[in-house]
UniProtKB/Swiss-Prot annotation:
Function comment: Catalyzes the formation of CDP-2,3-bis-(O-geranylgeranyl)-sn-glycerol (CDP-archaeol) from 2,3-bis-(O-geranylgeranyl)-sn-glycerol 1-phosphate (DGGGP) and CTP. This reaction is the third ether-bond-formation step in the biosynthesis of archaeal membrane lipids.
Name of the protein in question: CDP-archaeol synthase
Organism from which the protein derives: Pyrococcus horikoshii (strain ATCC 700860 / DSM 12428 / JCM 9974 / NBRC 100139 / OT-3)
Superkingdom of origin: Archaea
GO biological process: glycerophospholipid biosynthetic process
InterPro entries cross-referenced by the UniProt entry: CarS (IPR032690), CarS_archaea (IPR002726)
Cross-referenced Pfam families: CarS-like (PF01864)
Keywords: Cell membrane, Lipid biosynthesis, Lipid metabolism, Magnesium, Membrane, Phospholipid biosynthesis, Phospholipid metabolism, Transferase, Transmembrane, Transmembrane helix
Cofactor: Mg(2+)
Membrane topology: Multi-pass membrane protein
Main location: membrane
EC number from the UniProt entry: 2.7.7.67
Length: 170
């Protein structure tokens, strides 16, 4: 795979990465599950998934796509496509993260507990699925993202921990 293909894959997924990480900084407030419990007696999602974080991530990811358009308009073709793609990547990311939290609660994993694979690939796979109708990337680039995303996720978590935005470095 050529370097420009790797950069294109990274460029494509950038709104999703920002959408996934921004709730750490922008979150707080009312939990998405409103404190309700599932039929197993455990919280549906937990306090870590809030409306402010969800919509903050959606907005940040979409803004990243708009900025990308103005930096490299030929990649998208139109501002409308850039907004639509960034929005869907961001929405997919956040929905994927919510699904991951739901699964973790069912497995009785506490908030913030690392779930290797689920934490790194769940949001990525959901983002790619949501964005599929608008713009896809070649299989090789998807595979590259599957390899690089856990490393980026790990690095971002350590950075957020050192900045005091997260209580744990994972």
């Amino acid at each position: 795979m050529k370097m420009n293909q790797l950069l294109e894959a990274f460029w494509y997924i950038l709104p999703a990465y920002f959408a996934n990480s921004s709730p750490v900084v922008l979150g707080g407030g009312t939990p998405i599950d409103f404190g309700k419990k599932w039929r197993d007696g455990r919280r549906i999602l937990g306090d870590g998934k809030t409306w402010r974080g969800f919509f903050g991530g959606l907005i940040v990811g979409t803004i990243i796509g708009i900025v990308q358009y103005f930096l490299l308009p030929e990649y998208y073709g139109s501002l409308g496509i850039a907004i639509e793609l960034a929005f869907l990547l961001s929405l997919g990311t956040l929905v994927g993260d919510l699904i991951g939290s739901f699964i973790k609660r069912r497995l009785n994993m506490p908030r913030g507990y690392p779930a290797v694979g689920l934490d790194q690939w769940g949001f990525l796979i959901a983002a790619l699925c949501f964005a599929y109708p608008v713009k896809t990337i070649p299989t090789g680039e998807v595979l590259f993202l599957l390899v690089i995303t856990p490393l980026i996720h790990w690095g971002a978590n350590i950075f957020a921990y050192k900045m005091g935005w997260k209580k744990v470095p994972w």
